[in-house]
């Protein structure tokens, strides 16, 4: 009993005498734990980007902006729309486009460290025979001549396991059914990109507001972020896509060319605060023609064209304009311009591509040069 009492007093005296040192040690220990657990990864594990992308994608049709980080094709298409070497250093056709021979670059490796050979490159085309006479040559034999074939093989090619040849490697991919929900990319320096996909632009914006992502790629409607002091907005005009109206020329009203022209002249395109597109061909393309009819805003000419329509074409004239949620404000502005001509316009929001329509306002991804 005496020994226990003595030991208790000894411990008590020890804590009383060294309580300040013990308290400081406890604080340092707790602070060190949190520093190692939460702060150190941010300081030493490389840069982390969390990017939001709008759209539903499968693993075989991811956006080219993402694929370009991971993998290459035999060729690539530059900003001017020209086909340039990628995995292949050169190519030729000995028979005017029916047979294409591609020669691979030396010193290329997949992300698993294995050498890129003709046998490890996989393309699947119907009605095309592929021969691999050696490790550095692929021969594509088509049934008919096709001069744009080098553009076709700019499509990236993965090795099994989503292994590519690019700087970034797929370390994790999450699926929701058959759609990609998120994809994690890493590089040798330790940097990481987490790319999350959302079905609508509004859902992508909500993810940004909640902190699920710290950047959004290819945002069409910048509101409300243009007025946010904590958000940096970088405006870029995409030369690879265009906002356009598709007219159904089989429709009883829109089969009239003069009506379609009147609707084009009636839209005040200056309200949209963007660069006007003259056609569905990119200005960077060699085949772009700046001399096409511009259809500048001309309400007087639009009214004259409407007046000159046959009587039966003006009777009960009504147009349904179908669009997606992200383009609703644009569609409503266009509808007001058309209504100024005396046309009844109904705006309908549709989340996909409608099977039937009179006029369809959509974002069109411009394909590469043929």
Describe every region a protein language model picked out.
Residues 49-95, 103:
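N-terminal lobe/hinge region of extracytoplasmic solute-binding protein
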Residues 135, 141-195, 199-202:
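Gly/Pro-rich hinge or "lid" segments in bacterial periplasmic/extracellular proteins
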Residues 45-60, 99-102, 139, 168-171, ...:
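Short, well-ordered beta-strand elements
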Residues 19-37:
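Hydrophobic membrane-insertion alpha-helices, especially the h-region
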Residues 90-129, 207:
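Aromatic- and charge-enriched surface segment that lines or borders ligand/interaction sites
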Residues 174-183, 195-250, 349, 359, ...:
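Extracellular/periplasmic solute-recognition and catalytic clefts
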Residues 339-370:
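Periplasmic binding protein-like
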Residues 255-336, 340-348:
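Append "and occasionally in soluble cytosolic enzymes with long acidic Gly/Pro-rich linkers
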